[in-house]
UniProtKB/Swiss-Prot annotation:
Species annotation: Lionycteris spurrelli
Protein name: Cytochrome b
Keyword annotations from UniProtKB, A to Z: Electron transport, Heme, Iron, Membrane, Metal-binding, Mitochondrion, Mitochondrion inner membrane, Respiratory chain, Transmembrane, Transmembrane helix, Transport, Ubiquinone
Gene: MT-CYB
Entry's transmembrane regions: 33-53, 77-98, 113-133, 178-198, 226-246, 288-308, 320-340, 347-367
Further remark: Heme 1 (or BL or b562) is low-potential and absorbs at about 562 nm, and heme 2 (or BH or b566) is high-potential and absorbs at about 566 nm.
Locations listed in the record: Mitochondrion inner membrane
């Protein structure tokens, strides 16, 4: 008798995606982060759903409803901090996942890569809107500053900002629509994840060597299912430690003050996972230029496949490119630090140098070094 998982219309789709899927035999731990992102998404949707049952999207009661969740709802504090710190874990996994793709040349699967960029934008938009919902000081002023950036768009900017706000300032209408979109977006992300996997399974996974792995494949289950479960346990251990021991470590104390349009906080800054982009935005003195640089800091990933000059796919055997890759990582960490600092000497100049270096590495240095490496190998 044929196994039901191979004949049932629904089960056979799952079977070909997670059970009998042929996978390269040499995938390292860097390949765990895709499945970890899936777990993060599921966790965020679940905790978010239960939080939404108690949250009220109204300027008069939003802050108090979050306090009520933490104090009066059974395990509400756990839901709230799992959701807030789950977002941080989500972005840690996202950035490592993208970094893995850059390092091992996975971006040569252009469809999968481009859907991934869309996913990155969607998750960033979702996180931004979620940060506004507790209606603390940083929620309100973060929303005001970031949405106001759209006013830099020539001709339609001001109207566009007021259209998004639903009035002449960030107010009740803004909070309500942000809640609606924050609820909707994770489901759009889930749909995009399916498309991402669909394109990935058209080609099969890349592997650390960057060499076609067709002659040496193993079934996904049990080899990579057990490996993924180990990854889940490790990530959930870190998340649990964060939630139970220092839940506010990654948050901003200003967000424990209710939103007040008449009092601007001394340092307006987004959550830590947006600081690198915020630093790039601030490093350009012109408003429109800053906004363009902000968008391009992520959109630049779309041109990476076109700039791949090496005859080898992966950086595994390219030590010069490896040095540049880790310089890029150091640059991003520097930008993240700068984004959280006040706009004064020496932080401004450090941010400007790091911003230029970030774009230089991706657009100029990496293609050049790839050509040099080809020459060194007499290719």
């Amino acid at each position: 008798m044929t196994n039901i998982r191979k004949t049932h219309p629904l089960l056979k789709i799952l079977n070909s995606s997670f059970v009998d899927l042929p996978a390269p035999s040499n995938l390292s731990a860097w390949w765990n982060f895709g499945s970890l992102l899936g777990v993060c998404l599921a966790l965020q949707i679940l905790t978010g759903l239960f939080l939404a049952m108690h949250y009220t999207a109204d300027t008069a009661t939003a802050f108090n409803s979050v306090t009520h969740i933490c104090r009066d709802v059974n395990y509400g504090w756990l839901l709230r901090y799992l959701h807030a710190n789950g977002a941080s874990m989500f972005f840690i996994c996202l950035y490592i996942h993208v970094g893995r793709g850059l390092y091992y040349g996975s971006y040569t699967y252009t469809e999968t890569w481009n859907v991934g960029i869309l996913l990155l934008f969607a998750v960033m938009a979702t996180a931004f809107m979620g940060y506004v919902l507790p209606w603390g000081q940083m929620s309100f002023w973060g929303a005001t500053v970031i949405t106001n950036l759209l006013s830099a768009i020539p001709y339609i900017g001001t109207e566009l900002v007021q259209w998004i706000w639903g009035g002449f300032s960030v107010d009740k209408a803004t909070l309500t629509r942000f809640f609606a979109f924050h609820f909707l977006f994770p489901f759009i992300v889930t749909a995009l994840v399916m498309v991402h996997l669909l394109f990935l399974h058209e080609t099969g996974s890349n592997n650390p060597t960057g060499i076609p792995s067709d002659p040496d494949m193993i079934p996904f289950h049990p080899y990579y299912t057990i490996k993924d479960i180990l990854g889940f346990l490790m990530m959930l251990t870190v998340l649990s430690a964060l939630v139970l021991f220092s839940p506010d470590l990654l948050g901003d104390p200003d967000n424990y003050t209710p939103a007040n349009p008449l009092n601007t906080p001394p340092h307006i800054k987004p959550e830590w996972y947006f600081l690198f982009a915020y630093a790039i935005l601030r490093s350009i003195p012109n408003k429109l230029g800053g906004v363009l640089a902000l968008v391009l800091s992520i959109l630049i990933l779309a041109v990476v496949p076109a700039l791949h000059m090496s005859k080898q796919r992966s950086m595994m055997f390219r030590p010069l490119s490896q040095c540049l890759f880790w310089l890029l990582v150091a640059t991003l960490l520097t930008l993240t630090w700068i984004g959280g600092q006040p706009v004064e000497y020496p932080y401004v100049i450090i941010g400007q140098v790091a911003s230029v270096l970030y774009f230089m590495i991706l657009l100029v240095l990496m293609p050049l070094i790839s050509i040099v490496e080809n020459k060194l190998l007499k290719w």
